[in-house]
Amino acid sequence: MDKISLPPAEGVTQSAARAHARGGGRGRNPRGEGERLRDDILSVTLQLLNELADDQALSLRAVARAVGIAATSVYIHFADRDALVLAALERSHRDLMRSLDEAEASTDDPVGQLRARLLFLGQWVQQHAGLYKVLHESTLNQRTHMAFKEELGERTTAAIRRCMAAGRAPDDDAAAVSLDLRAAVHGAVSMRVNQPDLPWPPLEEQIDRFLVKLVGVAPVPAGRPSRERTTPKPT
């Protein structure tokens, strides 16, 4: 699979990453920079969640120490750990959606657009396995309805509808096909995260099979270049 250039953790600013790396102190923010401090807290939280892969293992004290502020300063912006984690995940999700849209824009072919979205998601999970687990496998995910995640399914359904409208896939219930496809793709990437030592085939080969068997697109003849085989442009 072609490598896609992604940041070390989605939504982590360079200043926050440096603060996390050195664990040093931080001067008082000038007046009017409360939003900047909030962004730094979210960035460090995303980095720590990606490392820990567990929202329950995150402490606000650790976040404050990494940012270089007093723990009480975190509470100015977030009522508790759940509120902080939810805000961080929502920002990460928003950044991911923007990157998926950019990947889709790399081709005008509707099947290529759908494939590009799925491949980018797979690459993102590889580089953000901890965040993926918190988003989909954490106790917070079980206890809380993360409404922002619904957008990912809606965008996938819209991409499938475009394939059907262009005659590239059989006319069907796009929402049902989307659910089947998302279940298959999330299963493939989740199993790679949780069972990395299994002899996995290249993810793009699995995705191509999903597109043929679940969406109904035409398979790519061996040896023939295809518009579907479009690699998302770097972000």
Regions found by a protein language model. Name each.
Residues 1-36, 221-235:
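N-terminal intrinsically disordered/low-complexity leader segments
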Residues 37-45, 63, 88-92, 96, ...:
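Generic hydrophobic, amphipathic alpha-helix propensity
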Residues 40, 48-83, 87:
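Helix-turn-helix
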Residues 85-92, 135, 152:
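Alpha-helical DNA-contacting segments of helix-turn-helix folds
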Residues 101-130, 181, 224, 228-230:
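Hydrophobic alpha-helical connector segments
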Residues 126-158, 194-197:
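Short secondary-structure transition hinges
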Residues 141-166, 175-179, 205-212:
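Amphipathic alpha-helical packing segments from all-alpha helical-bundle domains
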